């Protein structure tokens, strides 16, 4: 697919837009003034594969805490500002980017103060439009609609451009999947600033995964989007796991295993479900892009194996292990997974040797 060309901005050491890879973001839910807990969550996100983290600034104690957090964070920090523009001005001295909500940050004079502060340190601003908190002028005219979100974004982009500020990212979030997608689609032709994708208030893991896969995955397949967050209530690592899976399954991230497995049926004569769980757990650290298949019977296993780097075809009490469609071992069922994992390791080593 071809991505829409966008301006590239820099959040800390992470490039967003242009030809940069789609980055994954998340947000701490600890009180930012609780430096220890906030850093604990940031480190969890870092090891889960997050690229950028956002922290809420709710009061002056959060400003003090965030400065310390920034000193120790392994990830670039975006300050999330609502209502009080002076907090944005204060934290702009040390954070990597500012997110403002145009629905509650205040008028032109306040936005100007934030822009001037960000200019001094050359840090970007994300215009974070949210359907649940549109400016009164747009909600009164358009309601909490796609058009209202798009008009809010265009208006605020114009304000920043009038102040000669163009290090901008834009998000248009709704809890409604269709409205989220349409808002990004309708705004895209009118601006070349990078888009931060997300469905807001998406819920717990099950519903958030479905909503995000549809909305974010759909937009990414249309070439729309430069950075993203999967919002899941209270589940830090799951946000990153789901986001990375969306990127992999849309073909935008070539990292880790693409595991193909059958849904099982009446022909199954082995414990395929347990085998899959073991494979997922034992291979979650792998970064090398590999296609592997774990199939329960021979009906589709041979065909899938032809397109896989490494494959298992289970039978009744035994099965096959294959590399690039060729059988390398016929083993008893309890031996298959270990041999399969060994072949994956060997495939990775062989690639490294060939590339070295």
Swiss-Prot record:
The keyword Phosphoprotein does not apply. The keyword Ion transport does not apply. Binds 1 [4Fe-4S] cluster. It catalyses: (2E)-4-hydroxy-3-methylbut-2-enyl diphosphate + oxidized [flavodoxin] + H2O + 2 H(+) = 2-C-methyl-D-erythritol 2,4-cyclic diphosphate + reduced [flavodoxin]. Its cofactor is [4Fe-4S] cluster. It holds the Pfam family GcpE. Keywords: 4Fe-4S, Iron, Iron-sulfur, Isoprene biosynthesis, Metal-binding, Oxidoreductase. Pathway: Isoprenoid biosynthesis; isopentenyl diphosphate biosynthesis via DXP pathway; isopentenyl diphosphate from 1-deoxy-D-xylulose 5-phosphate: step 5/6. GO terms for biological process: isopentenyl diphosphate biosynthetic process, methylerythritol 4-phosphate pathway; terpenoid biosynthetic process. Its EC number is 1.17.7.3. InterPro entries: Dihydropteroate_synth-like_sf, IspG_bac, IspG_bac-typ, NO2/SO3_Rdtase_4Fe4S_sf. GO terms for molecular function: 4 iron, 4 sulfur cluster binding; 4-hydroxy-3-methylbut-2-en-1-yl diphosphate synthase activity (ferredoxin); 4-hydroxy-3-methylbut-2-enyl-diphosphate synthase activity (flavodoxin); iron ion binding. Belongs to the IspG family. This is 4-hydroxy-3-methylbut-2-en-1-yl diphosphate synthase (flavodoxin).
């Amino acid at each position: 697919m071809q991505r829409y060309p966008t301006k590239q901005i820099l959040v800390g050491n992470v490039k967003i837009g242009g030809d940069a890879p789609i980055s994954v973001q998340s947000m701490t839910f600890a009180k930012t003034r609780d430096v220890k807990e906030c850093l604990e969550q940031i480190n969890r996100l870092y090891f889960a594969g997050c690229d950028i983290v956002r922290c809420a600034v709710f009061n002056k104690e959060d400003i003090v805490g965030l400065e310390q957090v920034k000193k120790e964070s392994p990830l670039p920090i975006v300050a999330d500002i609502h209502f009080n523009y002076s907090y944005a001005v204060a934290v702009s001295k040390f954070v990597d980017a500012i997110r403002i909500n145009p629905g509650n940050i205040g008028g032109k004079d306040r936005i100007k103060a934030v822009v001037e502060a960000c200019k001094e340190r050359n840090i970007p601003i994300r215009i974070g439009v949210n359907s649940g908190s549109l400016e009164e002028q747009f909600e009164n005219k358009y309601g909490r609609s796609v058009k209202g979100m798009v008009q809010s974004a265009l208006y605020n982009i114009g304000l920043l451009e009038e102040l000669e500020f163009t290090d901008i990212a834009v998000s248009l979030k709704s809890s409604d999947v269709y409205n989220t997608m349409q808002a990004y689609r309708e705004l895209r032709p009118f601006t070349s600033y990078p888009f931060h994708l997300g469905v807001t208030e998406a819920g717990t893991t099950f519903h958030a995964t479905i909503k995000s896969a549809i909305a974010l995955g759909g937009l990414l397949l249309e070439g729309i989007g430069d950075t993203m967050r999967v919002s899941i209530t209270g589940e830090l690592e799951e946000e990153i796991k789901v986001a990375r899976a969306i990127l992999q399954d849309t073909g935008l991230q070539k990292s880790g295993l693409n595991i193909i497995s059958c849904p099982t049926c009446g022909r199954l004569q082995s414990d395929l479900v347990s085998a899959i769980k073991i494979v997922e757990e034992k291979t979650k650290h792998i970064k090398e892009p590999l296609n592997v298949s774990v199939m329960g019977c021979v009906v589709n296993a041979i065909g899938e194996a032809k397109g896989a780097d490494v494959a298992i075809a289970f039978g009744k009490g035994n099965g096959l292990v294959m590399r690039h469609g060729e059988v390398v071992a016929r083993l008893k069922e309890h031996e298959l997974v270990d041999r399969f994992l060994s072949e994956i390791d060997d495939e990775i080593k062989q690639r490294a040797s060939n590339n070295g």
